[in-house]
Amino acid sequence: MLDHRLAPEYEDLRRTVAEFAHDVVAPKIGEYYEHDEFPYEIIAEMGRMGLFGLPFPEEYGGMGGDYLALCLVLEELARVDSSVAITLEAAVSLGAMPIHRYGTEEQKRTWLPRLCSGEMLGAFGLTEPEGGSDAGATRTTARYDEATDEWVINGSKCFITNAGTEITGLVTVAALTLSREEGAEGSPTREISTIIVPSGTPGFTASKKYSKVGWNASDTRELSFTDCRVPAANLLGEAGRGYAQFLRILDEGRIAIAALATGLAQGCVDESLSYAAQRRAFGRPIGANQAIQFKIADMEMRAHTSRLAWYHAASRLQAGERFKKEAAIAKLHSSEAAVTNAREATQIHGGYGFMNEYPVARMWRDSKILEIGEGTSEVQRMLIARELGMTYS
């Protein structure tokens, strides 16, 4: 029998972050959204709280926590705002986790302390204009230059979170590497590897921020690499293992996104309950109408089942058990729950739900990307079917 009751230390963490989200994030985030500004002040406070180092060992500047703790934090943050939550999720799951999981001891000691403190943000350069769901279709190349013992990177990436802030310190880039060995027919062997590219490296450029429908307070950019040279020692893990690396990273990240989506879904419940109690029509609160009650009951059900799904996936991850299917289920269910809850919350608010000053308008805009980022809903269904042993052509 599954027991998803949280230990006291997790409940304490949840309460602390919930208070932070309510007292610090909520009063300020609307202004950041209005001006498409990155919330440096909020991010700095999150760094002081140790949130960026939650799942990492203390020897590297982390808090010695685990992935469950990170996901609890993401849920509580997203209950108020998703931009702040995705900044943390991408910085930890995509920026720091690959280095912790696959880096050399020198790479860990060079980068992790600053990433864990929040002094520096990391990003993961995977998606390309012609390679989103088909991540194996990477066209960015990294050629090894024996004369200088460097990788020379050329190509572009798109939709990369945390890629161009004032505190972005690195991007881990997935690239097609040409190995030093000759192929069977005399041509270089082609393989995907991941390489750490520090910000400010000549030939590495982050474009202007995208103008997005949602997540307006997060940083998302296109990256370009033109004869960008980095030391050979910046290779993350073994050459040719990049594809396997980012598949594992994405599997873990889906649990984090599921927690974030659950938070947004629950936030829609919170806002709808409050509005339904205050808004009066026909002489009584609209919450007295069964139609509104049923909507909110269904919204709570979706948020609750989403939470159970990501709890289960996270528990399997931490137990060292296979979790690919459970992560896909959690990501799929919670993201679709978030989209539905945001739509219903907007409907409950009526015309006010279409006004930017109401949080549900922001939640509505923020929700759709959850069905796309870190694996579309279609890809999640494909993964679930594959884990069930089904084949496809």
Describe each model-derived feature in a short phrase:
Residues M1-A90, Y102-Q107, R114-E119, D134, ...:
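Alpha-helical interface subdomain recognition
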Residues G50, L74-A78, A175-T177, V197-P202, ...:
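Short Ser/Thr-interspersed hydrophobic loop/turn segments at strand-loop and sheet-helix junctions
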Residues L88, L115, E130-S133, T161-E166, ...:
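Short Gly/Pro-enriched turn/cap motifs at secondary-structure boundaries
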Residues A96-Y102, F124, G136, R180:
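Flexible, glycine-rich active-site loops centered on histidine and acidic residues
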Residues G118-L126, V173:
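A short, Trp-centered hydrophobic/proline-enriched beta-strand micro-motif
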Residues E150, N154-T205:
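A short core secondary-structure module
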Residues G200-R229:
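Flexible, small-/acidic-enriched active-site or ligand-binding loops
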Residues L223, D227-A244:
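Long, acidic (Asp/Glu-rich), low-complexity accessory segments flanking structured domains
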